[in-house]
């Protein structure tokens, strides 16, 4: 279903779209400032995720890769284009070339408060795309990468429902499955250019089909122990463990956006 309206209204109308039309994944490449911090839009998209647990907003990271947006690290850093893209519970998408190199124009992190942004990377260079009013052309930008991530997410949502009796997944779980199964690029681990790496939808789908995730909860002061059995043999080269939660919305202009699990101390023991 194609749904077009003023962008400002779209964010605030997602509750209606979520319940009336069953919208679970959105994609948008609109910009709203550069290194804008925790704005009213940021708060809204984080609130969207709290009020609509299965929702995932997918955004472009922006095309200001060489800009200095006063983050404090000089040109080329901290230039994500819009507060909504800096949300804690959304995906901001970087643009990589066919050779898995970050495009020079692709906006870099971190977020205003130092968090990892962008979150994920996808092909956004020389993508054959539609062009208004009725044409097609090869286009480059994070606006080309963003729809690719939204499409992969839609397939992963469908895979989850097929493996769980038609039940909608939690948006936070889907975002963590996507990012934790990405192909690491750039510096080892997540970084401010590629996020968690280039999307690998097949590996994320396999994680869903194999049930390689745990949904659990823990109360304040509790200790929860989870055992993970790793298959033996030469075929296992790496174990990735990601702790994910949907964080409540913060106040506008908050210097530090995270509100929960501020004293959490995850510990991993290999036996």
Please give the residue ranges for each predicted region:
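Loop/turn elements at helix/coil->beta-strand transitions in domains of secreted/extracellular proteins
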Residues: 1, 20-27, 51-57, 87-92, ...
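Sec-exported extracytoplasmic/periplasmic mature domains
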Residues: 19, 31, 46-53, 95-98, ...
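A cross-family glycoside hydrolase active-site/sugar-binding cleft signature
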Residues: 3, 27-31, 58-62, 94-95, ...
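Subtilisin-like peptidase catalytic core
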Residues: 1-44, 51
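Active-site-adjacent substrate-recognition loops and nearby beta-strands
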Residues: 8-11, 34-36, 42, 60-89, ...
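Hydrolase catalytic cores
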Residues: 121-188
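C-terminal subdomain of the subtilisin-like protease fold in secreted/lumenal serine endopeptidases
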Residues: 158-236
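Hydrophobic beta-strand segments within beta-rich accessory/binding domains
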Residues: 227-261, 267-268
